[in-house]
Amino acid sequence: MHLLYQIGLFTCLWLTQYVGAEIDNYDENLVGTWSSKSETVLTGPDFFDPLDEDFFEPELPGISYSFTDDGFFEEAIYIIKSNATKPQCPKGFLQWQHGTYAINDTGTLVLTPFVGDGRQLESDPCTSNFSVYTRYDQVETMEKYEISMDRYHGRYKLELYEWDGTPKQPMFLAYRPPKMLPTSTIAVNTIQTAAKRWTAPLVPLAQKHTNTIWWVGLGLIAIGSIGYLVVS
């Protein structure tokens, strides 16, 4: 019965993605799935499963953004933040959100997530025996973006600049059309199956997730002299 529910829900979500959002200043060059150099982080079902509330940890940190031609976006981020005073205690973050995007007349790119849909998994092996799984949504304003052909890699490159001009790590075109989960909001659909998980702001996740993220801490210990490793 649970399997039939999942199939039906995914079918409905998939069909509703074609009811598109209107977008001004449409840029066909932006459409597609973009991924940082390692290409281990990609949007879509290989990163996050909204039905089972599951993250799938990539082999390496990185970022991925996808954009449709009708105004939807999705992002997948895997970040490792080191602790300068305790190199053996890096924090790992998995973040996923989706929603709509707009391109202003000035070229500013604004990403507005569906409230209640985004998820974050945080792991700190030195302070807790569990990962912490929470809702996550963060409006992102990119001061500008640039798309060019990278001559060295022979691929299209996307560079996003945050609201203050800080560049994110470059991403390269991985898929066109984009590889994404359904673009409709999932918050209403998941509230029944996930109600017990969201009775508190922070909820310990199943131990299975800590086992797969803790290798990050062990790897940094083995390297030894690394002061910090940040992917943002």
Swiss-Prot record:
It holds the Pfam family Rot1. Residues 22-211 are lumenal. GO terms for molecular function: unfolded protein binding. InterPro entries: Rot1. The keyword tRNA-binding does not apply. One of its GO terms (biological process) is 'de novo' protein folding. Glycans are attached at residues 83, 104, 129. It is found in: Endoplasmic reticulum membrane. It comes from the Eukaryota. Its main location: endoplasmic reticulum. GO terms for cellular component: endoplasmic reticulum; endoplasmic reticulum membrane. It is a single-pass type I membrane protein. Belongs to the ROT1 family. Required for normal levels of the cell wall 1,6-beta-glucan. Involved in a protein folding machinery chaperoning proteins acting in various physiological processes including cell wall synthesis and lysis of autophagic bodies. This is Protein rot1.
